[in-house]
Amino acid sequence: MSVVRENGVIVAIDGPSGAGKSSLTKLLAKRLGYIHIDTGAMFRAVALSAQRAGIASDDDAGLAELCRGLDITFARDGEACRVLANGEDVSREIRTEEIGLLTSTVSARQPVRQALLEMQRKMGAKGGVILEGRDIGTVVFPDAEVKFFLSASAEERGRRRYLELAARGESATLEETIAKVVQRDRQDEGREHAPLKQAEDAVPIDSTSLTIEEVLELMERTVKERLAQGDKG
């Protein structure tokens, strides 16, 4: 039986904050000609919208109503991919440290997870997509044909995040940034609904001492091998 869907396979990339999922997903999608669905950005857009609307992170009824009226889409802008919330470009606003921490809390609420789960499944059902997040291979698409779990040490992830913030002109110390990475890990791993964990059939990749190109080549080779198996099926 073929393992390839109408437009190709579904590739799930999970892992903790700062592991390099977004950068690698964008590059891999470009190489394969696949669509990149940034689920983390979707949750961040909900968190930003909730903050703006004055909805508390534990207000399930308010969050459910917010999600019903929220349209999250992605638009290509040259090499970049913009995130739109009800037509507004929020690509920059959702990437602050404050929204990042709020996202970990908001994304643990069941109404938010359910609303975005349905949205993500519709986006990726026909294959030819790469989704990255924290529970893609375990909850969103447990039947994804290719799964990766990308990780790196907290120190390395904090260092990468610190450099990102510095490049954007945001003030933070390396120690503070690493501490926030550890805090985010604790929140993501300990939440009740869909905690961060590696799928049993995922390919684990520790990128602490690997270059982006080395990780990218490993991922591309794995996907192409799976596609070849599907062609034979």
Swiss-Prot record:
ATP-binding keyword on record: yes
Family matches, as HAMAP family: Cytidyl_kinase_type1
Record's keyword terms, sorted: ATP-binding, Cytoplasm, Kinase, Nucleotide-binding, Transferase
Gene this chain is encoded by: cmk
Residues binding ATP: 15-23
Protein name stated in the entry: Cytidylate kinase
EC number per UniProt: 2.7.4.25
GO molecular function, one term: ATP binding
Biological source species: Geobacter sp. (strain M21)
A Gene Ontology term for the protein's cellular component: cytosol
Record carries keyword Kinase: yes
Main location: cytoplasm
